Structure formats: structure tokens, C-alpha cells
């Protein structure tokens, strides 16, 4: 083998190894974004149930019995810096085709999840108007019911996508570990606190 050919092979072998490590690290972080969203699913489901009770009480002319803020899911954006770098460079050309396809599918999924998490967050921002019920008018309640319907649809959609990514688009990686402090932060968010007053017996 000519020295120039040997040098080129060594160079690209090293470059691919470094790029692969960066991509795998980024994938692990992006998978943890999906895990983070699913950790909040019990809080989201409970809040949607509580909001339905609020709407039923309003329709019946009953006191709303609000005790807390509506809150919203915390959003972690998926990173794509390593993938963008690889896409605009030449290292991907030196990886096996199957690996390139697997990596591409994973990052497409992460980008879609990141976008849908942001859209879901906007819907919950709309629902946050319930934090000030005294200034709501009839038209506001109609808008809030529509926002509730959207939030329920987004919940189903985003939870499914997050679970799909964690089972089907891992590129052979596992999510970065979310420490106990992360779980504690979720528990302390308004979304995971009771919305309604506890009935006294």
C-alpha cells in the first residue's frame, strides 16, 4: 500500500471514530429528552383529568375549586450539532451505508420530537389562562375548551412518538441517565402539583 493511501485510510479511520463517538453521545442525550417527556406523562394525564372537571364545573355554574396553577410540561430540546457537523462533512461517506441510514432515521425522529414538544408547550401556554379565572369571559372559555382538546391530542401524539423513539430509533444507544435530582425537579413543577382543592369530609 502506498504511503499516501495508508495515511488517508488512517486519517479517515480516526475521523470516523471521533465522529461516531460524538454522534452516539448526542443520541444518548436526545433519547433522554424522550425519557424526560415520558416521566411527566402521569402528571399530564392527571392534569387533563382535572381540567375536564374544571370545565364541567364551569358549565354547571359551580365553583371551580382551583388550588394551584395549570402548569405545563417541561421541554428539553433535542441536540443536533454533531449530526449537522457530520452532514456537512465527509465522515459519513466513510461509514457503512446501514449505519448512515440508522443514524439519519434517529436524528429525523429527534428533530420531529423536538418540534412537537414545542408545539405541545404552546397549547399548554394557552391553558395557563385558567390561572386567572376571574378575568375570563364567555369567549375565553370556548377558546380554553378548544385548547384542552388540542392538549389531549398532542399528549397522545407526543407520548407515542417518544415511546417509539426509545424502542425503535436508538441507533444502538441508551438514554443518558436522568438522575434523582431531575425527578425531584419534575415533582416540584406546578404541573405535578394538585390543581383542585381537596374535598373535606
Placement of each model-derived feature along the sequence:
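Hydrophobic membrane-insertion alpha-helices, especially the h-region
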Residues: 1-5
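Long, hydrophobic alpha-helical segments that serve as membrane-spanning/inserting helices
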Residues: 6-201
Amino acid at each position: 500500500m502506498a504511503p499516501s493511501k495508508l495515511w488517508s485510510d488512517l486519517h479517515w479511520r480516526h475521523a470516523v471514530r471521533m465522529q461516531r463517538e460524538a454522534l452516539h453521545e448526542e443520541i444518548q442525550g436526545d433519547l433522554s429528552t424522550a425519557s424526560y417527556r415520558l416521566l411527566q406523562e402521569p402528571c399530564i394525564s392527571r392534569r387533563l383529568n382535572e381540567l375536564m372537571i374544571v370545565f364541567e364545573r364551569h358549565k354547571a355554574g359551580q365553583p371551580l375549586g382551583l388550588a394551584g396553577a395549570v402548569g405545563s410540561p417541561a421541554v428539553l430540546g433535542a441536540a443536533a450539532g454533531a449530526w449537522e457537523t457530520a452532514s456537512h462533512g465527509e465522515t459519513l461517506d466513510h461509514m457503512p451505508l446501514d449505519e448512515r441510514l440508522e443514524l439519519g432515521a434517529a436524528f429525523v425522529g429527534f428533530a420531529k420530537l423536538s418540534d412537537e414538544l414545542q408545539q405541545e408547550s404552546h397549547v399548554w401556554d394557552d391553558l395557563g389562562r385558567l390561572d386567572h379565572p376571574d378575568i375570563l369571559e364567555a369567549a375565553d372559555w370556548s377558546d380554553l375548551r378548544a385548547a384542552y382538546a388540542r392538549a389531549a391530542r398532542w399528549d397522545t401524539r407526543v407520548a407515542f412518538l417518544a415511546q417509539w423513539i426509545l424502542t425503535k430509533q436508538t441507533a444502538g444507544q441508551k438514554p443518558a441517565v436522568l438522575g434523582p435530582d431531575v425527578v425531584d425537579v419534575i415533582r416540584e413543577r406546578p404541573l405535578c402539583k394538585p390543581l383542585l382543592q381537596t374535598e373535606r369530609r
